[in-house]
Design a protein with these regions (language model features):
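Extended amphipathic alpha-helical scaffold segments
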Residues: 1-572
């Protein structure tokens, strides 16, 4: 057979010459090395075309199995030289030959199980390394890695019927290695568009069948890893050559969304931690928001993450609230959900580029938060969820509800009771703080605190949520009242700044209207109250506010209504 007598002898002679020119102690010039590398690539291309075009004839011969084994052994020997161009040629050859085998409609398969396993072994043994100088800014391994990954769909087509969890895990590991080993040279920054390699990796993942136990979870977990790449800290200066992964991250968010929605009823994706990992990863860009240094022209990563997270939560929350999942799984998922909720309401708006539209982003976040609150309330009050998770949520609502930022000393200090300084007067100020650039969101967060404390159905989850929110609502109202009591007398006949006046009136009206959950706030000694306990706690401040509001009829009227509510509970 000509394979043995001609082709394999030719490959053996080339391998022998490559050993000579790449011997560390050899005095071979770089030009000679490059020449033999190029010769090898040309020979491989010619051999590949011959084998691919005549595969049906060759595979019908009884010795084809041994010849195939020998060919792959030569491929392995060539890979051992760790030469970039040769490695690229080897995997292009493998893909081209495999693409002609076992095609649909063929009467006889070209590759039997043993031959397919040999091809799988060559591809899956490892991602073959190449000799490189990473300090060389011209180094570009994208074509090589693309050739390697492009061989997978053909291998997958042949092994699909015998696919198992182990093989899928190996595929995913090697695909991730290919993504992470890619250099950025030769490509424009992958911010708006995927590189060909990244596209091929995602397309390879999409073809993997998901009807085998454990595979959906494995895919979700791996795609979550791709999402995270853009937000991982960059290494030393030499790593600036690596891709940005921004476009990959956004595409992975969309793929994560689809995978989880398609398999939301699969218990294993929760128990394995895949869902938790996915939503935890989505929380990173949402929390970073404007702090993410890479500017995009298209949809920003935090917006895409928010959209995908909401779609995922809409699908999984009905499942996790009904399924009896392990407490550790539930707690991990809910911790990430709260992180996402807090990230949606938060934004650090200092030193922003001109391309940022704060008002438009705020409207997007408000719509997202209102959607999210409908999904998580009252489920967040479940006894399985730790109190600290609920407190993290309500504490963030408190901080984001602050329209005029107080001085640090006005807030409770570490290891101090939340309401320990509620009644302590502060020094008056004549310099008025600038209102938040996201005041509209601040009012939404305040409204949510009020809603959480309000009486609904007195169910255990509602009580838990009300208890978590009540002290923050009281503190929030107390800060505004204390500021008014301290600052207004210093203004004389000058009116209160419009933004502060609007805030004060809004809060007073909400407090008067609120009928709180009876178990949300501990009873005040000697006072029997049901729905107005929040006003009892604020009574000392309300009484002082009357004196400060002597010249402002509207404020005086609102404070008076609050005091009247307290009086009615005393029978006055």
């Amino acid at each position: 057979m000509c394979l043995q007598s001609v082709i394999f002898k030719l490959l053996s002679s080339i391998e022998a010459q490559l050993h000579v020119v790449h011997e560390p102690e050899a005095s071979t010039s770089e030009k000679d090395q490059i020449g033999w590398n190029e010769t090898t690539v040309v020979v491989l291309s010619g051999i590949t075309n011959l084998l691919a075009n005549y595969l049906d004839v060759l595979s019908s011969h009884t010795t084809f199995g041994e010849s195939w084994k020998a060919l792959l052994a030569h491929f392995k020997s060539l890979l051992d030289f760790k030469v970039l161009d040769i490695n690229t040629a080897v995997f292009k050859s493998l893909r081209q030959i495999l693409s002609k085998g076992n095609v649909k409609g063929s009467d006889t398969p070209n590759f039997d199980r043993s031959s397919i396993d040999l091809a799988w072994d060559l591809w899956s043994e490892s991602l073959p390394i190449v000799k490189s100088d990473r300090s060389d800014k011209r180094f570009d391994n994208q074509d090589y890695l693309l050739a390697y990954v492009s061989a997978l769909p053909e291998i997958y087509r042949l092994v699909e019927s015998d696919l198992d969890d182990g093989r899928v895990q190996r595929m995913l590991t090697l695909l991730r290695e290919a993504i992470q080993q890619a250099s950025a040279a030769g490509y424009t920054a992958d911010i708006e568009y995927l590189t060909p390699l990244q596209t091929q990796v995602l397309e390879s993942i999409k073809i993997i069948r998901t009807d085998i136990e454990g595979i959906p979870a494995a895919l979700i977990g791996q795609v979550a890893g791709f999402t995270a790449l853009a937000f991982e800290p960059r290494g030393p200066p030499t790593e600036t050559q690596r891709p940005t992964y921004v476009a990959l991250s956004k595409a992975s968010m969309t793929l994560s969304e689809k995978l989880i929605l398609d398999h939301s009823s699969n218990n294993n994706i929760y128990m394995s931690g895949a869902v938790s990992a996915s939503i935890s990863t989505l929380s990173k860009p949402i929390v970073l928001k404007y702090s993410f240094p890479t500017i995009t022209k298209g949809t920003s990563p935090w917006r895409q993450a928010t959209t995908s997270a909401l779609a995922i939560l809409k699908a999984i929350l009905p499942v996790i609230t009904k399924e009896e999942l392990e407490e550790s799984v539930m707690r991990s998922i809910w911790s990430s959900i709260v992180t996402i909720a807090n990230g949606v309401t938060t934004a650090f708006c200092h030193h922003l580029p001109e391309t940022v539209n704060i008002r438009d982003d705020q409207d997007f976040d408000i719509t997202s938060f209102l959607t999210l609150r409908e999904l998580i309330t009252p489920a967040l009050g479940s006894q399985v969820i730790p109190d600290k998770t609920r407190r993290a949520y309500t504490e963030s609502l408190f901080h984001m509800s602050l329209i005029h930022q107080p001085e640090p000393q006005e807030l409770p200090q570490i290891n101090q009771e939340l309401l320990a300084t509620l009644y302590q007067p502060r020094k008056g100020r004549t310099i008025d703080p600038t209102p938040s650039l996201r005041s509209k969101m601040s009012y939404v967060c305040f409204d949510e605190l009020v809603s959480l404390v309000a009486l609904h159905d007195s169910s255990p989850p509602r009580i838990k949520l009300a208890q978590a929110a009540a002290p923050y609502l009281i503190l929030r109202a107390g800060l505004t009242l204390r500021a008014y009591i301290a600052d207004q007398p210093l203004r004389g006949r000058m009116p209160q700044p419009l933004s502060q006046r609007r805030e004060l009136l809004y809060i007073l009206k909400a407090l008067v209207k609120l009928r709180c959950e009876p178990e949300a706030i501990p009873d005040t000694p000697g006072i029997d109250s049901e729905g107005k306990k929040h006003l009892h706690r604020l009574y000392p401040l309300l009484a002082k506010a009357v004196r400060a509001a002597a010249r402002d009829q509207e404020v005086l009227e609102c404070v008076g209504k609050a005091l009247d509510e307290v009086g009615m509970e005393f029978g006055l």
